[in-house]
């Protein structure tokens, strides 16, 4: 086991604080509408330019191990805020730095760290409740656009795109961000249920100019097994041909004679058929087939429950208004499924999301909810260079998370104003059990001005003057750093999602409280490099040349 270096008391805290400040100072320059960029060197390729707090935090490793421990703990604040709300990482870092700096001053003055921490916790709990009461629901498209704009660093085109996407696919829909091909941002909306399986044979194509298969008012046969014998599906084919409608077959696979017969029938115009593989694998495939069945009011023909494909009737087939199949995707538009059953299925999947511990599973389940409930929107980010593309995608991602958080828990005045208002409201109400807890409460409430002050500093203004003016105001009165004007923050469209501010404050206070109560730090001693004997011997070999 390696030897350890141990530091106690003030020595440990001074080192830790230095690390906290290095990381926080690098992150906080990005805060606000006039926040600056940070350039990150990469081992391969061009440097990354970003205004995303968590991206900056993740890059920082300090040489001194004690300082690095402080930096890593603040990095944890940014990561936690990012995981919880997807945004607010810089705000969380600024708050953590402010609470740690104020708290360690009090510890150095001889206060009891545990009482300080209890005071901080009381203040934070009271402010969180106050933020919830200040919060108003985010309902209109305009408000969603404003939240997106603020989070994307005042880029109104991003705000508009996100608002349009949410309008199209609903608040439950999946919105993804991809690299665009041009210079302009674009929004691509897929309505209905889409899954990533294309046609099994190009001979099914009936729209050659688009290279797709389009079926109007088709029947949909859902089968939970491979089909290789045409006899199995003959009864269904005959019934569908009699009804004069097209047929889409979704099965684990269709091969050999069965596929060849379907192609021949389609080419001769006897019956219009298309076949695709079922999406997903294993249990997920079964679940997705069931989703399609509920969406189209059909039944999955499965041998597991004693059903036979030869005995399938036309009543067991699903139906939809339209199906479009490309080389890679199948989209089912306007399935005739019962709304009540679809809602019940969505509720069931939501319960699975809550119970799941795997992020991957949660993401896949959320996709299923979106496909049943609304649709999928893709925001394609346009940029002139790859460096700009990365930076812009980061901002669009942040804005997307912020708007989701706003829809979930509502909105409050932005620009750090809500924290200042909440802090001043609870200042007279929250009381500790002793004077040292009261000091903890006061320092936590004072630290809540830090985001406002940092936004103003980044805009090149005098922080203490603006902070005093904002504190003298009431309600949503605050300072717009973008236009350098005072006014009602909600009317000016400067909004923050309540969830983002709340989680930033809670995570910052949690880690800061732990750092204030730190009394000892332990790290590995650096290993001494042993002299390389081989190198010395190599020099002697050179003597041979002198002879």
From Swiss-Prot:
Which residues, by range, are in coiled-coil regions?
Answer: none
The role this protein plays is: Together with its co-chaperonin GroES, plays an essential role in assisting protein folding. The GroEL-GroES system forms a nano-cage that allows encapsulation of the non-native substrate proteins and provides a physical environment optimized to promote and accelerate protein folding.
Chief place where the protein resides: cytoplasm
Any single Pfam family the record assigns to this protein? Cpn60_TCP1
Q: Mind telling me what this protein is named? A: Chaperonin GroEL
Query: Signal sequence span per UniProt?
Result: none
Query: How does the annotation summarize its subunit structure?
Result: Forms a cylinder of 14 subunits composed of two heptameric rings stacked back-to-back. Interacts with the co-chaperonin GroES.
**GO MF annotations in UniProt:** ATP binding; ATP-dependent protein folding chaperone; isomerase activity; unfolded protein binding
Xref: PROSITE patterns: CHAPERONINS_CPN60
Instruction: State the gene name recorded for this protein.
Output: groEL
User: What HAMAP family does UniProt report for this protein, alphabetically?
Assistant: CH60
Enzyme Commission number(s): 5.6.1.7
Cited Gene3D superfamilies: GroEL (3.50.7.10), GroEL-like equatorial domain (1.10.560.10), TCP-1-like chaperonin intermediate domain (3.30.260.10)
Q: Which organism is it from?
A: Glaesserella parasuis serovar 5 (strain SH0165)
Keywords on record: ATP-binding, Chaperone, Cytoplasm, Isomerase, Nucleotide-binding
